[in-house]
Structures are given as C-alpha cells and as structure tokens.
Amino acid sequence: MGNKESKYLEMCSEEAWLNIPNIFKCIFIRKLFYNKWLKYQEKNLEKRLKLLSFYHPKKDFMGIRDMLDMAPGGSYFITDNVTEEFLMLVVKHPEDGSAEFTKLCLKGGCIVIDGFYYDDLHIFITENPNLYKYPLIHYDR
C-alpha cells in the first residue's frame, strides 16, 4: 500500500475499518488504484512525448511567436514541460505566414487533439503525413 492508503488506515482504527460496509471499502480501494493507474499512464505518455524531441522553449509566448515568424511554413510541436498546461501543435502557413494553434490535452494514457483520442502520438503523426517536427532551437533541460 502507498502512503495515502496507509495514512488513511492509520487514521481509522481497525475496529472502525471493520464496521465500514464492504461496498464502500471496494469503492475506496478501486478509486485509489484507478488514480494510481491514471498517473502511471500519464507518466508513460510523458516519456513517449519526450522521446519525440519536442522544442522546449525557455521563453514567454512573445519569444515563441517571434521565433515562429522566422521559421519556414510547416507544423511544429511546442511545449515547455510536456504538461496539460502548455502542449501545442502549431501549423504555420507558408503563403501568408499566419499560424494556427491547437492545444493538446493529456488524458490518462491518451492525447486529445481536436476532441479525438489517440493512444499514441505516432498514430496521429502517421494519419497526418504533412506533419513534421522542426526543432526551431533546442534547449537542454
């Protein structure tokens, strides 16, 4: 058992735990294991995303925009720390230089792009052949 479970069980005396109906025990234990499984899946996804050599900016949004202005047309993955707060797919149009930003969300072991769930980002990349990763500037962490 992890820290949360053991702390919770320490708070409850053995007698109090025995008096809790089994259905509530099952719900409590299932929720704990489900949350652990989700965290494990998110960590796995983060590892896979990091292997794709994303661009890791150490700049604010204005700095990112300035670098995108100088980049050629194409699609870019931009993230600062591979979290749900800031993970984006940017498509820059070569004709007019405008850029479209799509926020990517991590949901357990999946990544959500425009409302569609992908178990692996490689599946999304293979479904979109015109998508490529272009490291504008690569910063070491």
UniProtKB/Swiss-Prot annotation:
List the keywords (alphabetical).
Early protein
Q: Which domain of life is it from?
A: Viruses
Q: What induces it?
A: Expressed in the early phase of the viral replicative cycle.
Q: What does this protein do?
A: Plays a role in virus cell tropism, and may be required for efficient virus replication in macrophages.
Give the family, as the similarity comment puts it. Belongs to the asfivirus MGF 100 family.
Q: Which protein are we looking at? A: Protein MGF 100-2L
Q: Which organism is it from?
A: African swine fever virus (isolate Pig/Kenya/KEN-50/1950) (ASFV)
